[in-house]
Swiss-Prot record:
<dbReference type="Pfam" id="PF00288">
    <property type="entry name" value="GHMP_kinases_N"/>
</dbReference>
<dbReference type="InterPro" id="IPR036554">
    <property type="entry name" value="GHMP_kinase_C_sf"/>
</dbReference>
<feature type="active site">
    <location>
        <position position="23"/>
    </location>
</feature>
<keyword id="KW-0414">Isoprene biosynthesis</keyword>
<dbReference type="GO" id="GO:0019288">
    <property type="term" value="P:isopentenyl diphosphate biosynthetic process, methylerythritol 4-phosphate pathway"/>
</dbReference>
<dbReference type="InterPro" id="IPR006204">
    <property type="entry name" value="GHMP_kinase_N_dom"/>
</dbReference>
<dbReference type="Pfam" id="PF08544">
    <property type="entry name" value="GHMP_kinases_C"/>
</dbReference>
<dbReference type="InterPro" id="IPR004424">
    <property type="entry name" value="IspE"/>
</dbReference>
<dbReference type="GO" id="GO:0050515">
    <property type="term" value="F:4-(cytidine 5'-diphospho)-2-C-methyl-D-erythritol kinase activity"/>
</dbReference>
<keyword id="KW-0418">Kinase</keyword>
<comment type="pathway">
    <text>Isoprenoid biosynthesis; isopentenyl diphosphate biosynthesis via DXP pathway; isopentenyl diphosphate from 1-deoxy-D-xylulose 5-phosphate: step 3/6.</text>
</comment>
<keyword id="KW-0808">Transferase</keyword>
<feature type="binding site">
    <location>
        <begin position="108"/>
        <end position="118"/>
    </location>
    <ligand>
        <name>ATP</name>
    </ligand>
</feature>
<feature type="active site">
    <location>
        <position position="150"/>
    </location>
</feature>
<comment type="similarity">
    <text>Belongs to the GHMP kinase family. IspE subfamily.</text>
</comment>
<dbReference type="GO" id="GO:0005524">
    <property type="term" value="F:ATP binding"/>
</dbReference>
<protein>
    <recommendedName>
        <fullName>4-diphosphocytidyl-2-C-methyl-D-erythritol kinase</fullName>
        <ecNumber>2.7.1.148</ecNumber>
    </recommendedName>
</protein>
């Protein structure tokens, strides 16, 4: 009781803050479509150093306000995954302390980098802090899974191999990878990309390589070339159908792939955000400046993955 009272007192005078980091699928294999409509996936996932920012202030009612350059793209706050995640956790934790969330929306939406899922995961982490819950609390994990397929991996926000429908996470120690991320400011609905893949209910994709049994992963301290070799052997199975829906994705990949110092260019998730891993941070920054100059209306970020 004393601990709960202490947490309530602290939260009442001090807002809690967290970052919702962008998720990047370095590889993404679609193994098949389950009879329940979900797709079985295997993906090497990393997290970038760009993020939305979320704040929680104690209050008697659950609410959300959103600001930032992407706020007009967010839609109705009542449908936001932040609210959905909080409500799902409230169904599992008696007398859950919630309050007012404030979202600073920096990441593009419907972009293949888990923006909404990362926001929901950040909300769950904030609520865990406010209610003295461990991040591995089964109720928190279950709420994350029920919120969305990408929310569990975003809850951890650590590089990993993600399998199943996103519920199984195998740790993978990645080095810091210099990266440029580009979104051409077109939204791509995940359901449309999967539909374009054309898998029937219960259909398996015979012959798809299992990334878990891929060639041995390099040590974290291994040279960049070793990591590029393994990652380049992978693929994003959603890239081809996404390019059919939004051909500009192909243009982005071409620009990134021919940039000086680019070692690997690929689409993340269901698009339209693409990324390129570079030889060093200077090359990444130069490429980002070049893309921004040629396409000032695109979202461009130079940073690191890890």
């Amino acid at each position: 009781m004393a601990r709960a009272a202490e947490l309530s007192d602290v939260m009442s005078v001090q807002a809690l803050h967290d970052e919702a980091r962008a998720k990047v699928n370095l590889t993404l294999r679609v193994l098949g479509r389950r009879v329940d409509g979900y797709h079985e996936l295997e993906s090497v996932v990393a997290f970038a150093d760009c993020a939305d920012r979320l704040t929680l202030q104690a209050g008697s009612e659950l609410s959300l306000t959103a600001t930032g350059p992407r706020v007009q793209e967010c839609g109705d706050n009542a449908d936001n995954l932040v609210i959905k995640a909080a409500r799902l956790l409230g169904e599992r934790v008696a007398d859950l302390r919630t309050g007012s969330f404030a979202l600073d929306k920096q990441l593009p939406i419907a972009a293949g980098i888990g923006g909404g899922s990362a926001d929901a995961a950040a909300a769950l982490r904030l609520l865990a802090r406010a209610n003295d819950l461990a991040l591995d609390d089964p109720r928190l994990i279950d709420a994350a899974r029920k919120t969305g397929a990408d929310v569990p991996v975003c809850l951890a926000s650590k590089s990993c191999i993600m399998t199943g429908i996103g519920e199984t996470l195998l740790p993978l120690a990645l080095p810091r990878l210099p990266v440029v991320m580009v979104n051409p400011r077109v939204a791509v609905a995940t359901k449309d990309v999967f539909a374009a893949l054309g898998l029937r209910s219960g259909q398996l994709r015979v012959g798809v390589t299992d990334v878990v049994t891929a060639p041995k992963w390099p040590d974290q301290a291994a040279p960049l070339d070793a990591w590029i070799a393994v990652l380049a052997a992978g693929i994003n199975d959603l890239e081809a159908p996404a390019k059919k829906l939004q051909p500009v994705i192909g243009e982005v990949l071409k620009l990134l792939g021919k940039a000086r110092g680019a070692r690997l260019a690929r689409m993340s998730g269901s698009g339209a955000t693409c990324f390129a891993i570079f030889a060093d941070a200077a090359a990444a920054e130069a490429a980002a400046q070049s893309v921004s100059a040629a396409h000032p209306d695109w979202w461009v970020h130079a940073g690191t993955l890890g």
